Amino acid sequence: MSELPSLFNPKSQIQNPKWLSAARWLFGPGEPGYLWPRWLFLRALGFIFFTAFYSLVFQIRGLIGPQGILPASEYLQAVGQQLGARRLWYAPTLLWLASGDRALQLLCWAGLMAAVLLMLNLWPRAALVVCVTLFLSFVCAARDFSDYQSDGMLLEAGFLSCFFAPPGLRPGLGENHPPSRASLFMLRWECFRIYFESGLVKLLSGDPQWRHLTAMDHYYENGPLPDWIGWYVQQLPHRFHAAAALLTLVMELGLVWMFFLRRPLRILLFFLVTPFQIAIILTANLGFLNYLVLVLGILLLDDRCLPRMFPPLKASLEAGNSKMETGNWKLENGNPAIAPRGSAAETGPRNGQSGLWARLSPVTRHSSLVFSGLFLSWIFYNTTVLLLLYLFRSLPLPLAPVVALEPFRISNQYGLFAVMTTARYEIEFQGTRDGQNWLAYPFRYKPQDPRQPPRIHAPYQPRFDWDLWFASLGAWRQYSWVVNTEVLLLRNDSSVLSLFAGNPFPGEPPTAVRAVVWQYWFTDLRTKREEGLWWRRELRGLYAPTFERDAQGNIGVHEKPAP
């Protein structure tokens, strides 16, 4: 067998260039000082993936199924016709293989199982690869229903965690594979960017509400899906809301720089951002977004402080590790010692293969360095460029690497609540059989009945209800899926009806369906106490064209909204 190149030859490691030593330091196993934060972070990330797939189980047929609002099959067919072989890069989804109802359910349930494995610390690295691949498959095919910043956040965090997680079936804390410095930094970098870029867009948007500290005065009322805690917080005086707006700007633009400072300041930052995120979780239904940002904050901690904060966690994990390690032995200086599963002592050369193993092991290690170095550096470049473009739009930077990775949603630009909405509008679908009496289709999560309190749903992500909030802020021509929904309701389509809380026409379908828009306001404490109303509302008129079905089953436009 010919001699391996010097880069992969163990006999010539002393001749390796300095860049390889630097690559090992940056992308290879780091110092074992963040084993506990990694362990807890990955379990929590598994929970977030679980909630993401769990919410899709009940929605995916109605959203992108063959009879759904935006069928994935039709979209992929159009992409394939336009891009040919390039479609696999610009739409990286497994739904190219099949996109029927069964395939969509299989995607969701496989994602759920992979998320459970990640929560149980079984094959964490492989489980992450499956979670990211399957969630990306949905995101690439769902169009309007996956155009959320939180989806990009989860894909970026999941992909980076593939390099952060320890290998093996049951790695425990992964003492033999501490996280690389680069992967830890990149996850912290993502968390920093979520905060800092959100602060930047608030300033750069020119929104007077942030400038005058009035942005939070109606934030709880006008968000995508308010909850009852936010209703009570809304009743507090303006001074409280002005202080909350100022705190948000100080946190996002100033305090988050502590991510890059010394250990005591990073730990202090953890105790600042954690209650900040918990407060958002309690007062707004933003899906899994703030849960993910909260979980990323765990990486501000280290092994010296985290076990002290969660003593039961330490005891249970140590007990589990002692059981897992029983029976795995190696020899050290002629004496037996415990060898962790997946270590070289357990999987190393045996049965006369030591020569081949010794030659291939460096190849594997260096290939891993090259792979992780390439992608982590690529993502860092892209995200740095996107951040700089917020500040210097005409900066002449190469954008080809940014564009190339864009379909994978793993190097993103963030910016939450740049401009605060000043009013709340709600789209409501109504049907009729006689053209006179219109019955509303009840929603599962959106505000509708003024007497019903706004509930807490997060981290569940009701994508249909969320997107209706976005649609209410624009014209119906920008949101063709609203019209698609009307047409499908005229047919009593079961896939779309599953997105609603009920069907006012359980037998024969309606002869006409329309989408109207209401304006909603929170009531005050007195009105709620005396009348039991959480909301007051006023009808503003048609949102989209009214569709009707004639006796032959033909569907046409009956009435259009005023321009």
Predicted regions and their residues:
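Intrinsically disordered, low-complexity repeat regions of secreted/extracellular protein precursors
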Residues: 13, 320-336
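Intrinsic disorder/low-complexity segments
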Residues: 329, 340-344, 350
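Cationic, low-complexity basic patches in intrinsically disordered or flexible, solvent-exposed regions
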Residues: 4, 12, 331, 354
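Alpha-helical membrane-anchoring segments
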Residues: 17-321, 333, 346, 351, ...
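Short intrinsically disordered, low-complexity coil segments enriched in acidic
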Residues: 1-3, 434
